[in-house]
Amino acid sequence: MNSLFSKRPLLRIAWVHLFSKKRQTIVAMLGVMFGVTVFIFQAGLLTGLQNYFIEKTVNTTAHVHIYNEVRTARPHVVTRYIDTADRWVVVRNQKPRDEERKVKNGNQIIGLIEKDPRVEGVAPFLGLQGIFRFGMSQQAGTLAGVDIIRENTLFKVQENLIDGDMLRMETMPNGIILGSGLADKLGASVGNSIIVISSKGVALDMKVIAISKTGITLQDNTRAYISLRNAQRLLQQSGSYITDINVRLRDVNQAQAIAQEYQSKYGYRAEDWKAANANVFGIFRIQNLTVTFVIISILVVSGFGIFNILMTIIYEKMPDIAILKAMGYRDADISRIFLIESLAIGSTGGLLGLLLGFITSKIVGMVPLNIQGFVSVQYLIINFNPLFYLAAFAFALVSTTVAGYFPARKAARFDPVEIIRSR
């Protein structure tokens, strides 16, 4: 170290300056360290949870969802015959229109979509509301009428099972797969018989063949899978009746363009997975902006701390600066001394922040939790992307360099004659 300083007098001078103000130097380093730690932890936590949600969403929902959109209610009968507001008319018992949710020619559309080389899988779907009864327990939920083999191609149903076997639905016509939360509410397990009642009042005896846990809280707490034919029976519909077509793509990033293409081609509403979850992605954007603002504020405050320390050193070391200039040191040399000091504070605080941020993220990621939000997580999901560490360290260096630049310029402009005369 001493040999290095002997060869590099500017480094030695900067070193002496920093250690002449140990307390202030340590406080400035701690400010940088804290900012970098918060940057790494918050970025890792937010992106970890967001990536986990996106992964779950991509694997458990359709990349493109085709359905018959329910249109707005028809105008009131009065408006057809009376177009002024100066009369009072009472109409009773106007019959509501029975909206047709069926996707007509669904099988033909599925056949055409299957031929699209961009498509990995396509499956019919029939969704309905129902009541689940098991003993004295009763829960409302949703029923997904599916072709279980096709559904597994899209959403890997078998991988999400925590008990039972989905293939039993092929040999057991009255089989049902319950979401884990729904099964817990009912107190039902594999092998139990439950009663399912539709909004039409049709009741079916079903046998639980499997329990599914996707990690998507709403699905696990309310959804059950049954065969497409049983769903049609519950709604008293024919074997061709479906309400939705779900599509899984080979490249999920093409979902928006393909959804628009299918909507134009087949005449039904087609929604890509990002549009379906637009509200959640909006929350993500707000979170990211908030955290970015907080992190920048912390690093800016630490930068002001470095600025104040260097300005204090400059005014205290004015005679030293005058002597250095009298010895032949140029303005650029004086500037370099104070820039070295700011970089030393920034790099040391940054490296300590990287270490503390990594340790904090590791420890927090190991704490067992049971969070039930959009998704269910047992532990906080932390993203250890190396780019976060590089960005945090780079930002620390930039902020401290900027903080040291102005004091360095001021020190370089001092006139040694004026300094000595004022003393």
Residue locations for each model-derived region?
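Mechanotransmission and gating elements of multispan inner-membrane complexes involved in transport
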Residues: 70, 182-184, 190, 195-291, ...
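Short, membrane-interfacial amphipathic segments enriched in basic
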Residues: 1-12
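Short helix-loop junctions at transmembrane helix boundaries
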Residues: 351-394, 405, 409-413
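Hydrophobic alpha-helical transmembrane segments of multi-pass inner-membrane transport and secretion
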Residues: 22-49, 285-320, 343-352, 398-402
